[in-house]
A protein has these predicted regions:
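N-terminal "arm"/small-domain region of PLP-dependent enzymes with the aminotransferase-like
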Residues: 1-26, 40, 116
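PLP-dependent aminotransferase class I/II
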Residues: 10-12, 30, 179-264
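Short loop-beta-helix segment that forms the pyridoxal 5′-phosphate
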Residues: 27, 39-61, 74
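Short acidic capping loops at alpha-helix termini that bridge into adjacent secondary structure
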Residues: 45-49, 70, 156, 178-179
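Conserved PLP-anchoring active-site segment centered on the Schiff-base-forming lysine
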Residues: 65-86, 98
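Active-site phosphate-binding strand-loop segment of PLP-dependent enzymes
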Residues: 93, 99-163
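Conserved PLP-binding catalytic core of the aspartate aminotransferase-like
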Residues: 245-246, 255-288
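PLP-dependent enzyme catalytic core of the Aspartate aminotransferase-like
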Residues: 286-287, 296-365
Length: 365
């Protein structure tokens, strides 16, 4: 579970419990109290915010509202962008990231954005790599979208775990732009995965209204709204959580690296780990430890897995399980991983700097 191991703020839990006494009434269609709280927290106008039942809900509603002809995504990245867009007929253009370059997004990503029918997604930090996107890369992509009449969506669901999250957020830019949007949720940092609460910020009034109309009439429950408002107010809890997880992330990364595993440096609450055998996740599972296998991500394989940064006790157990798994005899699937990615439905398009290329894939099957 790559959510805050400390769980939600006690104030958020108390607010949710109190709101249960009002569940006989319909919630506010537009979650105006939450919108006001988000506007204060993010420093953006209220009319630049639309709320939904989690980030995934908004991703699907955006796809339904915009109906893009084509989307541009990094590979690997969160699969929901492509799944939602392809469901509504979009062609998916993948931009492969290189392990040799630390899975960082190169500046040439912007050049894969072509025209008004495009929606480009940047996950910052990226899932599953945990790598932050260089602000200059985001700026180049935003400028390209503004020039081409396209839309850039920056997913900041994991950004709260970064030490300089506020400085790195592009929420302020999105709030005054027709071609940039920021997506975030209360799932990860706030530990509220079960309540389903997310939001999008953009200065594009047509986009905001389209997303609102594309979903159900009451996407946010009164309980989720109350918990979200209280969570935003508990700034100290979030700050303390961020500091603790930063220390645990460094500790776990060191422990896994000392076992000979390749660990991608991360600014999120998870680590991407390269293992020497395909069956390492199975050996971990046999010890009661579950990790996310990454063969479903483009350009990754079964040799890669994503592990959550949790409490010291849980992290120590994970490190010990890895140690035992690596010592186990009879490993299957040894060898170099195949990182060629998914099937291509058109030729590869060379990246501008020669390091990356965009590949068009059809995920509608």
């Amino acid at each position: 579970m790559n959510v805050n191991p400390a769980g939600p703020s006690p104030r958020a839990v108390a607010a949710a419990c109190k709101a249960l006494s009002r569940i006989d009434a319909y919630p506010d269609r537009e979650s105006l109290a939450l919108v006001r709280a988000l506007a204060r927290a993010q420093g953006v106008p209220e009319d630049a915010i639309v709320c939904g039942a989690g980030a995934s809900d908004i991703i699907w509603r955006l796809a339904a509202a915009v109906r893009p002809k084509r989307i541009v995504v990094c590979a690997p990245t969160f699969s929901e962008y492509a799944e939602a867009a392809s469901y509504y007929g979009a062609c998916v253009q993948e931009f492969p990231l290189s392990e040799a370059d630390g899975f960082d997004v190169p500046a040439s990503f912007a050049r894969a954005i072509e025209g008004p029918g495009d929606v480009a997604y940047l996950c910052n930090p990226n899932n599953p790599t945990g790598r932050l996107v260089d602000p200059r890369v985001i700026d180049a992509a935003a400028c390209r979208c503004e020039q081409a009449g396209a839309l850039l969506v920056v997913d900041e669901c994991f950004l709260g775990f970064a030490p300089d999250a506020r400085e790195r957020s592009v929420a302020a830019r999105a709030a005054c732009s027709r071609h940039v949007a920021v997506l975030s949720a209360f799932t990860k940092l706030y530990g509220m995965a079960g309540l389903r609460l997310g939001y999008l910020i953009s200065g594009n009034a047509q986009l905001i209204e389209g997303i609102r109309r594309a979903g159900q009439a009451w996407p946010v429950s009164s309980v989720a709204e109350a918990a979200g408002i209280a969570a935003l107010e508990d700034v100290e809890y979030v700050s303390r959580t961020r500091d603790v997880l930063a220390g645990e992330r460094a500790w776990l990364s060191h422990e896994l690296s000392s076992l000979g595993l390749s660990v991608v440096p991360s600014d999120a609450n998870f680590l991407l780990v390269r293992t020497p055998a395909k069956d390492i996740p199975e050996r971990l599972y046999n010890q009661g430890v579950l990790v996310r296998t990454c063969d479903s991500f483009s350009v990754l394989s079964r040799f890669w897995c994503r592990v959550a940064v949790r409490t010291r006790k849980e992290n120590a157990r994970l490190a010990m399980a890895f140690s035992r798994a690596l010592r186990a005899e009879g490993a299957s699937g040894e060898g170099e991983p195949d990182e060629r990615g998914g099937a291509s439905c058109s030729g590869a398009m060379a990246g501008a700097d020669g390091r990356g290329s965009a590949k068009e894939v059809d995920t509608r099957g």
